[in-house]
Every structure is written in C-alpha cells, then in structure tokens.
A protein has these predicted regions:
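Glycine-rich loop-to-alpha-helix module at the N-terminal edge of alpha/beta enzyme cores
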Residues: 60-152
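Conserved C-terminal structural/oligomerization subdomain of aldehyde/semialdehyde dehydrogenase
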Residues: 1, 60-63, 226, 251, ...
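ALDH superfamily catalytic-core signature
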Residues: 261-408, 437, 471
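Short, well-ordered beta-strand elements within core beta-sheets of diverse protein domains
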Residues: 61-68, 85-89, 177, 288-292, ...
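Rossmann-like NAD(P) dinucleotide-binding subdomain of oxidoreductase/dehydrogenase enzymes
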Residues: 153-299, 428
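Terminal low-complexity tails and localization/encapsulation signals of metabolic enzymes
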Residues: 1-65, 99, 103, 151-178, ...
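Residue-level signal for inorganic ion chemistry
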Residues: 59, 97, 119, 199, ...
Length: 513
C-alpha cells in the first residue's frame, strides 16, 4: 500500500498510465438484475425485493439487484459452515492457499478498468480514484496477506513448574463482513484477504448503494474456479440483510465498517445472539494541527486540503478539523479558500474533474443540512457552502468543497461526522489549548500535526487521543501498520498482523512431564 495522497496526481487528474473506462462494457453488464452468490452459485432471492442503483453524477438508474432475505443469509451461512467444517479450505496447505490469494490479486489487476468503472458509476468518485486507489489497493492487499499465510506462529509460554504450555491460533470459522459505500471493493478486500489467509470462510454484504464492484469481484473469482464452493458468499441487500448476519447464531465473527450508530447496534446483536466477536471501524472527526513552525507551510496547507477533499470527503479518517495557529490562520484560510474555489466538479470520468458526486441524494442532503447548521451557528463560509448545479451537474449530487472559518470546536459541524467535503478551520494560541480541543471529541480515529520542533512533535503525538497520528504528512497508510481508532471510532484494527489475529481464536495447550 503506497502513500495515500500524491499532490501532483491530485492536481492533474490525468488518465496517463491507466486504462480508459470501460463504459460500454459496464452498460451491457448492468442490463441484468444481479443476484447473490451462495455456495458457488448465483441465486435469486426468495422475496420479490429488487434494489435499484443510481449514478450519483446524473441521478439516473444504472442497474439493479435482488435483495437477500433471511433465507438467503441462512443458506450462505450454511454453505460457509460446510466449507469450513468439511471443505478443504481451512485444511489446505498454506502454500496452496497463498497461491490462490496471489491469483485473486492478479485477477483484480487484470480486470482493474472494469472494476474501477463500476465503482465510479455506483459511487460517484473520480475514475482516477477508483482505479489508482480502490482497485489497486484491493489487488495489493490480497498479495500482502498471501505472504502472511505461512508466517504466522504460535507461542511458547514461559510457565512455572514441570509443564510445557504453547499457544495456538486457529481460524475463527464463519465470518460475517459488512462493507461500507465509500470504498466498496477496497473495504471488501480489506476484510476478505486476512480472513481467507487464516483459513476462514466468509459471508460478505456490500452496501446497498454500491454493490456492483463486489458483485463483479465475486464473478471474476467464480469464473476462475479457484476457490471451493462456500468459501466466499455474497448476500445483497440493505440494513435488514446486515442484521440477519449480525444476529445469526451460525456466524462466529462479524466485522463492520460504517457509522458509529450502526456499530452500536451490531454490538447489541452480538449480545442478543451468540456473543460473537465484533470488529468495528466506525466514525471519525480527526484533528489536524498546523503549528506556526510547520515545515514547508504551503505544502502543509495543500496537503491538509487534499487529505480531506479527495474521494469527495467520504472518508472516515479525513482530517475534518484543521486547527491553525493564530499567527498563520489568515494565510491558511485564504489558501484553503483558493483551492476550494478552483475545484471543478462534474463527470467523474472526465480527467479534468477534481471532485465527483456524493454517493446518494439522501447523503447529499445530509451534508447540506450540516452546512446550514454551520452557517446558523455563526461559522463563516470561506468557500462553497452549497450544492453545485452548474451545467450538467443539475441532476447530480454535487456539493461544493466547503471551508468554514471562525469555527468554535463546540459547534455541531466540529463535533459530528459529516462525511463529506466540509472542512472546519479553528484557530488556537497555545499547545495545551489545541491538544484539549483536539481531544474534545467522541471519536479518536486519526490525528495529525505539523511542526519543525521534534520535541513538540513527540510530546503532542503522545497526548493526542487517536489510534493513528501523522506527523508532518497527514494520511500515510501502509498494510504493515495498524489502521483503527480509539473511543467511539471502533474496536480492533485493520491491516498487518493485528487484522489476522482478529480472524483467529486462541488456544492454550498444556503438557505435564
């Protein structure tokens, strides 16, 4: 996994070096109503529920799928259980399992343009973002975890007396995985790859607004005939389908990325069913602190902007609260306003476009309501603050990049997750003051700070209440480093060995001699 933001690439948005969108192919592929994938077969739902998917860039229907109900979830869980208990996957040699995962990685790369096209049609993000970020990373994470299959060890416990005690980690079993709308194929891969690497089987549900790239991924794997039936299962639908997963007695673990509100419900579902472990990657309101001794101030301001406004701000770890020292506050606000005003919104397949459409009309309206709240509470709109309906954008769900200045940290826009292109710029005077404000949040996913003072960097990083802290470059992610938050930003970690551990159950074995 590479650095999340390349400023030159973000500013240019060219298709140089990547395949062109496969729009005609996608149009034909989307003609048929899509089905869930259970036990190696595509099945229609027993109910008559059909979901329509809308292109956020123009408000037009692009395709549909059958919603899965309780019967389909039951069948998927039964197939996954059989594949785990009786099938070859959990008992397969690690070398062979790694080979299959490398094949999946290669297949994703081979079909990269197809998957990116579906992602952009479904989600509204730029094609360059779908291609270079989402699909590329999905391929990379399968390759990364393929390398872990034969490198995961147990422990020899230093117990007292005439005993030998060892600890093993076994596959946890059938995993329910619920994926969000903002990075559909990427988040699916984040969850599928470590689960499969440890020998588990999966029932995965994509977001109802953005299901098509996951459907195509399962098609690609199915066509390659490389996984035994039942190892991976795909159930389509809305929150009710997700509830069947989270409450199911036959599922051994649930992992979820999405809102804190839904995360709480999944915890209740676990308590009301079989107390299955739950991994949660939830909301964020990440603080980004710009001290007046920041190295290369212009780049720090620019990166603070792009760290939020790529992927149209629909990012849980986005630095949505920018705390700026009062000595440089006006300069930062003016530059941020210039960047926001320069952004071109429109067709996400147009290489000149800087920002695509919000995922749905409902989500756009939610963002606009937050913007109105900011205005009413006294924040000053520096740029944006409205829907973009210019030209062909009239029917799309576009929100101008919005910069709020003179924000008080207690305002609604500074405390609640907006999940859109809205930045709160908050002044501060002292180090202790800004640490207190940064930590004044129910969330604790990410945080950033910019300073030339090494002592300050270390001191502040230790005091920030967040699962990830970025010093002098916000948004540095790598599969080798854990991704996840504190407080109400979730439980558990994605990436590295930490994700693998969450897909295992630990056993201590004692020998007397």
């Amino acid at each position: 996994m590479v650095e999340a933001i390349n400023l030159k690439q973000v500013s240019e948005r060219k298709f140089t070096g990547i395949d062109q969108p496969k729009l005609e192919w996608a149009k034909n592929w989307l003609k048929n109503t899509k089905k869930s994938y259970v036990n190696g077969k595509w099945i229609e739902a027993s109910s008559s529920s059909i979901f329509e998917s809308i292109n956020p860039a123009n408000g037009e229907k692009i395709g549909s799928f059958y919603g899965a109900g309780k019967d389909e979830v039951d069948k998927a869980v039964a197939a996954a259980r059989s594949a785990f208990d009786q099938g070859p996957w959990s008992k397969m040699t690690r070398k062979k399992r790694a080979k299959i995962m490398h094949e999946i990685s290669s297949l994703i790369s081979k079909h990269q343009a197809e998957l990116a096209t579906l992602e952009t049609l479904d989600n509204g993000k730029l094609y360059t973002e779908s291609y270079n970020d989402d699909v590329q990373e999905a391929s990379d994470i399968f390759a990364y975890y393929a390398g872990w299959t034969d490198k995961y060890y147990g422990e020899n416990n230093p117990v007292e007396g005439d005993f030998l005690s060892i600890t093993t980690r076994d596959p946890i079993g059938v995993c329910g995985q619920i994926v969000p709308f903002n990075y559909p194929i990427d988040m699916a891969a984040w969850k599928l790859a470590p689960a499969l690497a440890m020998g588990n089987t999966v029932v995965l549900k994509p977001a109802d607004k953005t299901s098509f790239s996951a459907i195509r991924l399962f098609e690609i794997i199915d066509e390659a005939n490389i996984l035994p039936p039942g190892v991976i299962n795909l159930v389509l639908g809305d929150g009710s389908t997700g509830s069947y997963i989270s409450r199911h007695m036959g599922i051994d673990k649930v992992t979820f990325t999405g809102s804190t509100q839904i995360g709480r419900q999944l915890v209740r579902d676990s308590a009301d069913s079989n107390l299955k472990p739950v991994s949660l990657e939830l909301g964020g309101k990440s603080a980004n602190i710009l001290f007046d001794d920041a190295p290369n101030l212009d780049e720090a301001i620019d990166r603070s902007f792009y760290g939020l406004f790529t992927h149209k701000g629909e990012k849980c770890s986005a630095p949505t609260r920018l705390f700026v020292h009062r000595n440089i506050y006006d300069k930062a606000v003016n530059r941020l306003g210039e960047l926001a005003d320069s952004y071109k919104l429109g067709d996400p397949f147009d290489p000149e476009t800087n920002q695509g459409a919000q995922v749905s009309e409902e989500h756009m309206e939610r963002i606009l309501n937050y913007i109105e709240s900011g205005k009413q509470q006294g924040a000053r709109v520096v740029a944006g603050g409205k829907r973009d309906t210019d030209g062909d954008n009239i029917n799309g769900y576009f929100v101008r990049p919005t910069i709020f200045a003179e924000v008080n940290n207690s305002m609604k826009i500074a405390q609640e997750e907006i999940f859109g292109p809205v930045l709160c710029v908050i002044p501060f005077d002292t180090e202790n003051e800004v640490i207190k404000m940064a930590n004044d949040s129910i969330y604790g996913l990410g945080a950033g700070l910019w300073t030339n003072d090494v002592s300050r960097a270390n001191r502040v990083a230790k005091k920030l209440e967040a699962g990830m802290v970025f010093v002098n470059k916000y948004g540095c992610y790598d599969f080798a480093s854990p991704f996840g938050g504190w407080k109400q930003s979730g439980w558990g970690k994605e990436f590295a060995v930490h994700s693998l551990q969450s897909y295992t159950k630990q056993k201590a074995i004692w020998f007397a001699y």
